[in-house]
């Protein structure tokens, strides 16, 4: 059995930054550190940080006065931000800069009195945070997930309308929704560059290349990870059997027993150690040496806040 690895895969710059913010805060201030929502959607990462003293909460009211609070990589609404400001808290923002970019687009539309449409998945924390940047009562903020949602949507003024997208969507599905928006609202204005982030796009391109060669595709990522789910869906659309797994223990030998080639990739919030564990598991089932496919090189780095720029090894 051949083992192929997608390239790129795993951590993106936004996830790296968010995890570093929590790790550095723990090193500098000591436990406990409070984090609103899972800092990234990966069970292994969250459990590891929890063991080191991070406490994950959903409501600001759960945080005691004088504590350190970190916003997750998915971002928060202005209401949550204002609630935190009203408290005696030290706040660090781990919102991915590419999510912040979308926040700024929504805030700009709100200031201008334009209505705004967000393409995204209802209930996802990134969507909740992005929708929460709009505050103009004279306008309106709407969420659509599919072309069907677009055709049933009514707005107040089609002449002052813009759209944005969640950063972790399917590139193909989002293109279909944008096409529907432009047909339904010919004057709608979109971002100069697609809001779907570079890492999401690159990993979808990589899994497409992987699925062209593999019989079975394993996507390492947690069930609540939007970008990981999109990778599994894309492989399935290409006619491959695909499984979303948290770790190597999830793999059933029956999944790969008849496969000549198994492809492995990882969502943007999944650490490489999980991929290495999957490779080891597949080798137990008769797999050969893992081969990494050629892919797009990623060199993007997002800096942590200056107050947290410290060599953790020196602190420890």
UniProtKB/Swiss-Prot annotation:
Keywords linked to the UniProt accession: 4Fe-4S, Iron, Iron-sulfur, Isoprene biosynthesis, Metal-binding, Oxidoreductase
Active-site residues annotated for this sequence: 126 (proton donor)
GO biological process, one term: terpenoid biosynthetic process
Pfam name, any one: LYTB
EC class name: oxidoreductase
Binding site for isopentenyl diphosphate: 41, 74, 124, 225-227, 269
Annotated signal peptide: none
Catalytic activity: isopentenyl diphosphate + 2 oxidized [2Fe-2S]-[ferredoxin] + H2O = (2E)-4-hydroxy-3-methylbut-2-enyl diphosphate + 2 reduced [2Fe-2S]-[ferredoxin] + 2 H(+); dimethylallyl diphosphate + 2 oxidized [2Fe-2S]-[ferredoxin] + H2O = (2E)-4-hydroxy-3-methylbut-2-enyl diphosphate + 2 reduced [2Fe-2S]-[ferredoxin] + 2 H(+)
Record pathway: Isoprenoid biosynthesis; dimethylallyl diphosphate biosynthesis; dimethylallyl diphosphate from (2E)-4-hydroxy-3-methylbutenyl diphosphate: step 1/1; Isoprenoid biosynthesis; isopentenyl diphosphate biosynthesis via DXP pathway; isopentenyl diphosphate from 1-deoxy-D-xylulose 5-phosphate: step 6/6
E.C. code: 1.17.7.4
Binding-site list for [4Fe-4S] cluster: 12, 96, 197
Classification via InterPro entries: LytB/IspH (IPR003451)
Keyword Secreted in record: no
PANTHER family attached to this UniProt entry: 4-HYDROXY-3-METHYLBUT-2-ENYL DIPHOSPHATE REDUCTASE
HAMAP family in the record: IspH
Family assignment from sequence similarity: Belongs to the IspH family.
Subunit relationships: Homodimer.
Record-given protein name: 4-hydroxy-3-methylbut-2-enyl diphosphate reductase
Source lineage: Bacteria, Pseudomonadati, Pseudomonadota, Gammaproteobacteria, Enterobacterales
Encoding gene (name): ispH
């Amino acid at each position: 059995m051949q083992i192929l690895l997608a390239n790129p895969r795993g951590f993106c710059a936004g996830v790296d930054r968010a995890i570093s913010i929590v790790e550095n805060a723990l090193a500098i201030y000591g436990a406990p550190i409070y984090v609103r929502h899972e800092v990234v959607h990966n069970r292994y990462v969250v459990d590891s940080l929890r063991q080191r003293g991070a406490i994950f909460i959903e409501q600001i009211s759960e945080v005691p006065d004088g504590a350190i609070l970190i916003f997750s990589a998915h971002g928060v609404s202005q209401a949550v931000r204002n609630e935190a400001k009203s408290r005696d808290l030290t706040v660090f923002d781990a919102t991915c800069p590419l999510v912040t970019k979308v926040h700024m687009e929504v805030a700009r539309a709100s200031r201008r009195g334009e209505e705004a449409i967000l393409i995204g998945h209802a209930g996802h924390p990134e969507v909740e945070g992005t929708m929460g940047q709009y505050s103009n009562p004279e306008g309106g903020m709407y969420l659509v997930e599919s072309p069907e949602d677009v055709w049933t949507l009514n707005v107040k003024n089609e002449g002052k309308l813009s759209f944005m997208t969640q950063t972790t969507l399917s590139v193909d599905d989002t293109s279909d929704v944008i096409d529907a928006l432009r047909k339904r609202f010919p004057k709608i204005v979109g971002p100069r560059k697609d809001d779907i982030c570079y890492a999401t796009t690159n990993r979808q391109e990589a899994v497409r290349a992987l699925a062209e060669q593999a019989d079975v595709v394993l996507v390492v990522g947690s069930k609540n990870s939007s970008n990981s789910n999109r990778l599994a869906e894309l492989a399935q659309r290409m006619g491959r059997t695909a499984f979303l797994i948290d770790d190597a223990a999830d793999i059933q030998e029956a999944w790969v027993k008849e496969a000549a080639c198994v492809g492995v990739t990882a969502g943007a919030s999944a650490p490489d150690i999980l991929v290495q564990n999957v490779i080891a598991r597949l080798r137990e089932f008769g797999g050969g040496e893992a081969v990494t496919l050629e892919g797009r090189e990623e060199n993007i780095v997002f800096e942590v806040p200056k107050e947290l720029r410290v060599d953790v090894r020196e602190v420890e």
